[in-house]
Amino acid sequence: MNLISIPAFQDNYIWLLANRQKHCVIVDPGESAPVLATLAQGQYVPQAILLTHHHNDHVGGVADLRHHFPDIPVYGPQETAKKGATVIVNDGDSLTIAGQNYTIIAVPGHTLGHIAYYSSPYLFCGDTLFSAGCGRLLEGTPEQMYASIQRLAQLPDETLICCAHEYTLSNLKFAHAILPADQDIATYQQQIEQLRSKNLPSLPVKLQFERKINVFLRCNDIDLQRKIGITSPPDSLVSVFCELRSRKDSF
């Protein structure tokens, strides 16, 4: 399989996953022009569009892509029905597209209907789990978002996180501010600074490594809890998540 990240807007990624026959899926096309250019350059033949949620920077290119490819199915959660989705999918559903199997995982939090698509080893998780971070809670509750990222964290170690924004460096700066002595975070921040200075993507990233450097996946870490002022055992790890998310929102 050939995985391509297509830059869009200021920091979005539209994902394209193609097989050897150059049949491909397009994930979260916020705009059409860079997708059409990539399709033409690589002579890819789109088989489906996958939408994770309803925000315009993820669905804005659907109408024009369907103008160019009228028969292409557009999969998405119920909240994308008015944003171009032609096939509504739900938690636990399975899809087979161009010989590749996809499992739908409900991950509410950023939006109430947000979903992820998992096709081993690829995880297209939209704005739920970022490298070294997680999405803002724009519609859902902290309980929902924490449960969602924990659900994704249970996937196999080799899972490749294909999220929709290049937020890695800013997320690592926050993580380093919380855990300045953490060598994994400090070293990775330096690596990503070099990568981004060359305008290269920091994604995808393996889930096994993400568990080390993503503070939102380390809410049970006692040292982290102390660093954010939680000195006694918390009532629930959601409270740790809430404190981290609040601090990140104002970072």
UniProtKB/Swiss-Prot annotation:
Binding site for Zn(2+) 2: D57, H58, D127, H165
Superkingdom to which the source organism belongs: Bacteria
Cofactor or coenzyme needed: Zn(2+)
UniProt catalytic activity: an S-(2-hydroxyacyl)glutathione + H2O = a 2-hydroxy carboxylate + glutathione + H(+)
Keyword Cytoplasm among record annotations: no
An MF annotation (GO) of this entry: hydroxyacylglutathione hydrolase activity
Binding site for Zn(2+) 1: H53, H55, H110, D127
GO annotation (BP), single: methylglyoxal catabolic process to D-lactate via S-lactoyl-glutathione
Cofactor annotation remark: Binds 2 Zn(2+) ions per subunit.
Biological or metabolic pathway of the protein: Secondary metabolite metabolism; methylglyoxal degradation; (R)-lactate from methylglyoxal: step 2/2
Keyword field contains Lipid metabolism: no
The entry's keywords: Hydrolase, Metal-binding, Zinc
UniProt signal peptide: none
Protein family according to the UniProt entry: Belongs to the metallo-beta-lactamase superfamily. Glyoxalase II family.
Described purpose of this protein according to its UniProt entry: Thiolesterase that catalyzes the hydrolysis of S-D-lactoyl-glutathione to form glutathione and D-lactic acid.
Assembly notes: Monomer.
Name listed for the protein in its UniProt record: Hydroxyacylglutathione hydrolase
Organism per entry: Yersinia pseudotuberculosis serotype O:1b (strain IP 31758)
Gene giving rise to this polypeptide: gloB
